[in-house]
Amino acid sequence: MLKFPCLVLDHDDTVVQSEATINYPFFCYILDQFRPGQKITLQEYTHGCYHTGFAQMCREKYGFTEQEMQDEYLGWQAYIKTHIPEPYPGIREVIHRQKAEGGLVCVVSHSCNENITRDYAAHIGLQPDDIYGWDYPEHQRKPNPYPLLEIMKKYGLKPEQLLVVDDMKPAWEMANKVSVPIAFAGWGRKDYPEITEEMTSLCNYAFADTKDLYNFLFES
């Protein structure tokens, strides 16, 4: 019997290594186009996404208009079509074991569905059961609990039958609102001890490596 019938996985920096190699470099380009002369470090970018979420960071810190938000999104979509991130070692085994045991794998992410399905096809060899990505209206994206409520409704699951696996605080906010347990994907935040410390204290579980998650789910 599975410990959690449904895994709810983040995508960026949980399944694939995309922040430093794809998302941050593109945002530097966009910032130079929209706000010439303004700079952002990788650490500032990470902390902005962690504490406020990407969209709010763009609006509050850089004053992006709604048109600029839309232009950024369209540019990002075009950029990531030719930039495919690598998966974290071991995450494929977690996903395949969950499915082999009859479980569900859903994705709740700020990536768009097209890129998630592409990455799963390229690296995982199967597709998630459901995806709640950036394509959804903003009020239905994490940290709003809408994705979790929809998953529970669709599959007839209770909160304790889901496990969110994510590296960022908005996921904790989402899960906490509906009493769904969450595991910190520490393998995506090894260079950020302050984030690791806070998420470890907030989340129900914390794992430094995908192997630790695998052992917890299937071997313990």
Each predicted region: which residue ranges?
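N-terminal helical cap/lid subdomain that shapes the substrate entry/recognition surface
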Residues: 2-93, 101, 114-115
